[in-house]
């Protein structure tokens, strides 16, 4: 641990095998599945400057500002607390394109779970309507869906076997992306992957409101350690870490049981 002396720490139990497997069930995901990457269609990182990004723990919103090729970008991103849904509002002087990229899982342990050189081992299909679309993903025996809706003048197209582009024709794009494994809610045929009914999902404004209300409740109804009167100069940093840890707990451990250790960020 780079402290200049040996230190002892506990390891997970390895024997007997049944006990080890029970520990692994809570500790590790046997087949990590990367559901997708959503990002701006900006290919040259060297053209990006004046980066200013911060996470507002009080509302759960990530606010990002930067310039790309001398064009300004402002991106606001939130997550709906009750759905597997993210929502983003983008304003820019330049071109606005959002890429949905999908990779095959690696099955590894200490990587990002993405194998980008195995396009033929999985498949992505797109069905679009006015201001909405359903992306159907097939990976081995796994089938899941991403429902996308947007506001503004934009079009969505498939640019590769496992790549989708949502391109705005204006200076603003607001969209939501809902990940869903149960096709019944979408009215999707399990065999064809074709949707018969595209439902409404919350837009950016509604997601931002739900996120803000959820985090307000989390911070005002819970408690935390106040180190404001502690004279030790390390108190401020310790308090910052406590608050950040509580945020991560609220964001990642809201289920009935703790998530697998290898699934944490």
List PLM regions with ranges.
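Aromatic-residue-lined binding/catalytic grooves and analogous aromatic/hydrophobic interfacial grooves
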Residues: 1-265
């Amino acid at each position: 641990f780079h402290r200049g002396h040996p230190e002892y720490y506990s390891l997970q139990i390895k024997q007997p095998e049944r006990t080890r497997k029970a520990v692994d069930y809570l500790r590790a995901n046997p087949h990590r599945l990367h559901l997708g990457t959503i990002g701006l269609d900006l290919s040259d990182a060297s053209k990006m400057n004046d980066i200013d990004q911060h996470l507002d723990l009080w509302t759960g919103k990530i606010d990002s500002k930067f310039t790309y090729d001398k064009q300004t970008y402002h991106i606001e991103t939130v997550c709906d607390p009750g759905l597997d849904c993210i929502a983003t509002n983008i304003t820019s002087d330049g071109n606005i394109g959002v890429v949905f990229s999908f990779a095959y899982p690696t099955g590894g342990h200490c990587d990002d779970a993405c194998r980008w050189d195995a396009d033929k081992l999985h498949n992505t299909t797109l069905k679009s309507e006015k201001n909405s679309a359903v992306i159907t993903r097939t990976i081995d025996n796994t089938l899941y869906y991403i429902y996308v809706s947007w506001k503004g003048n934009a079009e969505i197209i498939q640019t590769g076997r496992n790549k989708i582009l949502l391109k705005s024709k204006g200076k603003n794009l607001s969209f939501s992306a809902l990940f869903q494994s149960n096709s019944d809610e979408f009215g999707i045929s399990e065999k064809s992957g074709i949707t018969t009914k595209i439902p409404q999902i919350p837009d950016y404004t509604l997601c931002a409101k739900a996120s803000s209300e959820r985090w307000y409740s989390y911070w005002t109804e819970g408690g935390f350690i106040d180190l404001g009167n502690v004279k030790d100069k390390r108190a401020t940093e310790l308090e910052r870490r406590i608050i950040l840890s509580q945020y991560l707990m609220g964001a990642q451990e809201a289920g009935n049981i703790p998530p697998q250790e290898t699934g944490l960020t």
